[in-house]
Amino acid sequence: MKNINPSQTAAWQALQQHFEQMKDVQISDLFAQDKERFSKFSATFNDQMLVDYSKNRISAETLEKLQALAKETDLQSAIKSMFAGEKINRTEDRAVLHVALRNRSNTPIIVDGKDVMPEVNAVLAKMKQFCDRVIGGDWKGYTGKAITDVVNIGIGGSDLGPYMATEALRPYKNHLNMHFVSNVDGTHIAETLQPLNPETTLFLVASKTFTTQETMTNAHSARDWFLSTAGDQKHVAKHFAALSTNGKAVGGFGIDTANMFEFWDWVGGRYSLWSAIGLSIALSLGFDNFEQLLSGAHAMDQHFAQTPAEKNLPVLLALIGIWYNNFFGAETEAILPYDQYMHRFAAYFQQGNMESNGKYVDRNGNPVDYQTGPIIWGEPGTNGQHAFYQLIHQGTKLVPCDFIAPAISHNPLSDHHAKLLSNFFAQTEALAFGKSLEVVEAEFAAQGKTPEEVKHVAPFKVFEGNRPTNSILLREITPFSLGSLIALYEHKIFTQGAILNIFTFDQWGVELGKQLANRILPELAGDEAVSSHDSSTNALINRFKEWR
């Protein structure tokens, strides 16, 4: 990967000049000027996913200039470097190969002179065997009963991805009940365990190092809960499995290392649901469906690696995002899935994007002079319409939005899905085209009201429009199509990081708080006042000690 400051490129200067021409252009005018706009600014992937980016404040010239930026920052070589297993995560000296985990074509991928695919396939085979035994009831607990409940204990990438995917694909779930515990707040594990039976519960402890504070605190509490009924330490082996690389610590915990599922340092946490970290997904859906999830992602990987930038969906979405973030000053992006099963999708990519591209230092080690990652947020529709859409429609912040919906519902109750999708279509139309004062006044006139009667209220009913959106319409949310959708967003994030000259695959920003927490923890043990911090932190700790 080349370390090129994007703001110093000729393409960036051209985009700044172009922005002056585009900043007041109306989306409605762009549609009026070109009856073929939709067909020119949309694409269908694999007959499964329609991506419509026509309702954006872009022209063909905008895209040409954005593509020139991708070319001048040598995006293509960055993509090749990732797929080739080069150590593009330079601050940790690691390759970045979540694409290897779902490499269904099994072509060799070399890291340090060694093909990683045999090991990837071996872990997948081990996962399949384990899943078949647990789902089929052959795996028995310490009293000889089959497993009914699975508790995944992890945090961050070891929790968000598996939880998102098992929820999104809930229509495919089998008889196993899945539970996810992440927060070190004791309430999370206590409430999760309260209705469960230790005789039929299986715990998955997901921690690469087996030292993550939150995960190991919860794992020890889960083990204590289990042993309070089971009694004998040897029974732990039948009720706990590990997703880890630390065999010594796993064995010391009481887990049989035969039930330890490994992954590698070239798998980043927030890109790890495709690895052994996805064991909870495979247990919930069955291994065949987990393989379909991998296959859907692999299909998008091939599209990303092989399609010219002009028609490459992750690249196009990434460039449009850079356009808003750096030239329009949009600080946030909303992800709005019109599907209740997808209720954790925005949270998942909140981590995926903000932990990846929330960086202020470039790949040369210098502070950047441009915007990097946006703030990501969102909720399912139509709930969001009754919460925060007011600001998106009529507020002073520009919030580009991704609207996501399936054409086919897993729950075709009455006319529910038609009503849901009518809102999905209506919102992007309303955001793009708005409603003028003339239309508002005409509507009032049609109701028989005089201009004097409506003068005081008409301005408040005006919608300026010109709010940009992407629409992603899936045929149906299946393991395959969800895999493709997740990979689309992953590669969008990679593309933005590559162009913006930052390291997307480290996360040093989480370290300082952890270090300070480790220092503060022993200070909370006694009752004596603390004075080793600033006045605010001292006062907060001391008030906590008074009140606890």
From Swiss-Prot:
GO terms for molecular function: carbohydrate derivative binding; glucose-6-phosphate isomerase activity; monosaccharide binding. It is an enzyme of class 5 (isomerase). One of its GO terms (cellular component) is cytosol. Its main location: cytoplasm. GO terms for biological process: gluconeogenesis; glucose 6-phosphate metabolic process; glycolytic process. Coiled coil: none annotated. PROSITE patterns: P_GLUCOSE_ISOMERASE_1, P_GLUCOSE_ISOMERASE_2, P_GLUCOSE_ISOMERASE_3. It is found in: Cytoplasm. InterPro entries: G6P_Isomerase, G6P_Isomerase_C, Phosphoglucose_isomerase_CS, SIS_dom_sf, SIS_PGI_1, SIS_PGI_2. It catalyses: alpha-D-glucose 6-phosphate = beta-D-fructose 6-phosphate. Keywords: Cytoplasm, Gluconeogenesis, Glycolysis, Isomerase. The active site is at 355 (proton donor), 386, 514. The keyword Isomerase applies. NCBIfam families: PRK00179.1. Belongs to the GPI family. Catalyzes the reversible isomerization of glucose-6-phosphate to fructose-6-phosphate. This is Glucose-6-phosphate isomerase. It comes from Serratia proteamaculans (strain 568). The lineage of its organism: Bacteria, Pseudomonadati, Pseudomonadota, Gammaproteobacteria, Enterobacterales. The gene is pgi.
